[in-house]
Amino acid sequence: GTKALYFAPKASYAASADAVAEFAEMVDALHENGIECLMEFCFAPGTPSGFVLQVLHHWQLRYQIDGFHLVGDASLAEEASKDALLRKTKLIFLGFDGARIYQGKRPWFRNLGEHNQGYQYHIRRFLKGDEGSLSDFTYYLRRSPETHGVINYLADHDGFTLYDSVSYEQKHNLDNGEDNMDGSNENLTWNCGAEGVTRKPAVRALRLRQLKNAVLMLMTSQGTPLIYGGDEFGNSQKGNNNAWCQDNK
C-alpha cells in the first residue's frame, strides 16, 4: 500500500492552498459550536507504538483534536490509555480487554471506547430474524462495561449503508473494477423480498419499517450510538459494500 503522511492534512480535501490553516480553522469553528472533532487513523501491523503516540500527540497539540479512532492493532489501547498527554482524549479501538488494562477497577476518566463490531453483527442478525439471535440481542442491547465506553453502530464506512442492509442480500461491486471480488461476502442483510431498487409498495413499506426498527434499537441501546453519514436520510450505494473508490454521493 501507499505510505501515509501521518502529520499533514490531506491537501485535496482543502478548498485553499493552505490545508494546514484551513484544517485548524475548521476545528476551531467546530469547537465554537460545541462540536468535538475526532480523527481516524489506520496504522499498518508492526508500526512502533512510539511512532503512533507521536502522531497522536502532534494532532492533539497542534489542532486540539478531541479524540482518535485507531484502526488496526488494538494492543495499542493499553499504552495509549496510560499516556499522560492523552489521558483526557477519546481513544477508540476495535476490541481490547478493558478489565485487564484497568485490573478490574473503574478508571477515573473513561477515555477508552470500543468500536463495537459485535453489536453490528448480532443486532443485524436479530433485525432480519435469524434463529437463535435473541440472547445475543439482549446482551448487546444492555452491554455497558465499567472500564470503557462502547460505540454501537449498524453501518459504517466498511460495508453496506443502513438502507442497503434492508435492500440487498448480495454485494454489487462491479463498478469497482475487481470483478465483484472485493468487499465482504458476509453482510447479515435481508432485502425484504426484492433485490435492490423496486417499485413494489409492500417491499418498500417493509424496508421503511425495518429502518425504523434498526434506528429504534440503536438509540435505545446502552452506549454511544454512531450513525453513518447519510443513513439519516436513507442513502444508498446501490449495493456496493466497498465504495471507497467511487467518486459519488
PLM feature segments, named:
Residues A21-R106, E114:
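Active-site neighborhood of glycoside hydrolase catalytic domains
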Residues A77-G229:
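Conserved alpha/beta catalytic core and glycan-binding cleft of carbohydrate-active enzymes
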Residues Q237-K249:
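Extended hydrophobic/aromatic segments used for targeting, binding, or gating
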Residues C42, G46-P48, V166, H172, ...:
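Short, function-defining helix-loop hinge/capping sites that tune catalysis or transport
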Residues G1-E36, P45-R62, D175-G196, N248:
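Aromatic- and acidic-residue-enriched carbohydrate-binding clefts of CAZyme catalytic domains
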Residues F7-A8, A14, L154-A155, T161-Y163, ...:
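Generic, ordered loop/turn and secondary-structure boundary motif
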Residues Y228-F233, Q237-G239:
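Short acidic/histidine-rich active-site segments
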